[in-house]
Amino acid sequence: MLRSLKALKLNSLNAQKGIRQFCSDSKISGQVIGIDLGTTNSCVAVMQGAEARVLENAEGGRTTPSVVAFTEDNQKIVGLPAKRQMVTNAENTLFATKRLIGRRFDDPMTKKDMTMVPYKIVKGPNGDAWFEVKGKMISPSEAGAMVLQKMKETAETNLGGPVTDAVITVPAYFDDSQRQATRDAGTIAGLKVQRIINEPTAAALAYGFKKDEPKTVAVYDLGGGTFDISILEIVGGVFEVRATNGDTFLGGEDFDNALLEHFVAEFKKEKGIDLTKDTMATQRLREAAEKAKCELSSTLTTEINLPYISAGPSGPVHFNMKLTRSKFEQLVADLIQRTIGPCNICLKDAGLSTSEINEVILVGGMTRMPKVQELAKSTFNKEPFKGVNPDEAVAVGAAIQGGVLKGDTKGIVLVDVTPLSLGIETLGGVFTRLIKKNTNIPASKTDTFSTAADGQSEVEIKVFQGEREMAVDNKLLAKFTLFGLPPLPKGVPQIEVTFDIDVNGMLQVIAKDKATGKAQQVRIQTSGGLSKDDIARILKESEANAEVDRKRKELVEARNNGESVVYQVEKDLVEFKDYLSQPQTEEIKKAVQAVRDVLAKEDGSAIEAEIKKLHDLTRSSFETAYKAKLDSSASKSSSTENKENKDNTTEAEFTEKK
């Protein structure tokens, strides 16, 4: 155990040094995409010239559902196709996985989540929360990586080439382990994560880009799974965060669950049937809840109709319910109220009153709800600004930051903060802070400590993050031991502990005995997360799966091509039947059948080979037949024209001159 001494040295980086370090990235050659990895939906954008462009996915959407599914034949599907099959495959479909990224299995929030989702949440190898799908363990970082891969593919399709560099956003109130887990997800997805930035900061960047007027803004960000509130000063291209607060387990998913519980309770009261025992019925209700929630943002009432939701003694039972906006607001009133506390704390930490806030920016899909807008207005005593797209602003801001890092976008500087205090456990279990919450990052601080007992030859250093006064009540990030201390009386050894937090908000801790010079350091990674070996293994599996996916895609494309070719050839056979010989027709039909036969096989190369044979065979035959048909048509046309001319010929009248 360590004993606190008076700090001998303070190395907090001043704002200007932080700015220089923030902008001193090495030159990036390729495009840098900005990704909003959301709980419910994700979005990707890129700077093109002086503007940020949101990129559309293969389905034509500007946002992509953060959903990953595994089908009966173990095929992985991501995004909208995965969401569409959730009802029939709920147990093998992962959604809202961001809520568990970097969380321990025994975390109360994990236990709560286990009661709300149809898939299995299990204890991972190091005590963190993982998922089990079809007997396979999947970490939240892996699930996030699958969504990030989808966003990467979307960018590559739109930009016409490979993309490797990205800026990824996280909730401002994410702790160190959650940030590290998000970076791991990016690495697994094959991305070089150039920067992790906070979602409200990114949204403020999207709002303030190309605006010259100095402003103090509050970003009220209520998304699918998290709530953040950040207060920033925007002056001359410098976006400086004054304070941030939030709740990493409050968002649209909770609103959906409140509606779901209401539906289940009402149906049980009316019909006497508990729908929670039917996974498919529950998933249908969940989707209906999400739809009703969205509709009630623009209408005062909606109707939920789900035929054949269950069966009773007398036959099928249907679900029919009318829901008013007023009733919905009653059901989620406590959730909306939970955003007030963080807002007030954020104002206090920033040292500002509501009158000093020039603009309140609404971000996140849930801010479309009128009651949420009313609360934001009453909390800050001003009408919220609704001029940014709540679903796209974060990705746009990340793309702008990508342009800054690449060197293409000038005059923009972000100065962010660490959301929670960082420190170590000292004598008596006290949490001794080294870096306080809302400290500008990057930052470094060194404090000196000593031993708590005589003759200690080693000390264990436990690193925590949080705001409680006792270490045990905060989140343990890491622990390590400094060995080889001289056996001196307690209080004599001087041990320097240095906390370095980088621009991504990630922490490195160094402990050093001043007398011997012996030191030990640890780069914090998620306490129950992925080691370098884990990431390497997952990357290897991902590469192997990528090859399988590529072959499967080639097979599907070959089959589609084969079916299209067969259809066209059979159509041409009918069209040119009068211009092909019997042997030619029979030979072509035989080749068509060969393609049909091979389509049932799992061999794309064989399919393409048979298609080529059919092409080679029909090319000359159909060309000859086509010319013959043209000649025949021309001949008939000429014959008809001559006949018409003959029919139209009249004898000239003349008078013989005498």
Swiss-Prot record:
Bias type Low complexity, positions: 631-640
Name of protein: Heat shock 70 kDa protein, mitochondrial
Bias (Basic and acidic residues) ranges: 641-658
What Pfam families does its record include? HSP70 (PF00012)
Q: Which domain of life is it from?
A: Eukaryota
Q: Please report the organism this UniProt entry assigns to the protein.
A: Dictyostelium discoideum (Social amoeba)
Would the keyword Ion transport be found if you checked this record's keyword annotation?
Answer: no
Instruction: Give the protein's function.
Output: May function in protein folding and assembly, and disassembly of protein complexes.
Key words of the record = ATP-binding, Chaperone, Mitochondrion, Nucleotide-binding, Transit peptide
Q: Which NCBIfam families match?
A: PRK00290.1 (NF001413), prok_dnaK (TIGR02350)
SUPFAM superfamilies in UniProt: Actin-like ATPase domain, Heat shock protein 70kD (HSP70), C-terminal subdomain, Heat shock protein 70kD (HSP70), peptide-binding domain
Instruction: Please provide the Gene Ontology terms (biological process) for this protein.
Output: chaperone cofactor-dependent protein refolding; iron-sulfur cluster assembly; protein refolding
Respond yes or no to whether keyword Mitochondrion is given for this record: yes
InterPro entries linked to this entry:
ATPase_NBD, Chaperone_DnaK, Heat_shock_70_CS, HSP70_C_sf, HSP70_peptide-bd_sf, Hsp_70_fam
Coding gene? Answer: mhsp70
Residues of the region (Disordered) are 629-658
Q: Give the family, as the similarity comment puts it.
A: Belongs to the heat shock protein 70 family.
GO MF term list: ATP binding; ATP hydrolysis activity; ATP-dependent protein folding chaperone; heat shock protein binding; protein folding chaperone; unfolded protein binding
Q: Where in the cell is it found?
A: Mitochondrion
**One Gene Ontology term, aspect cellular component:** cytoplasm
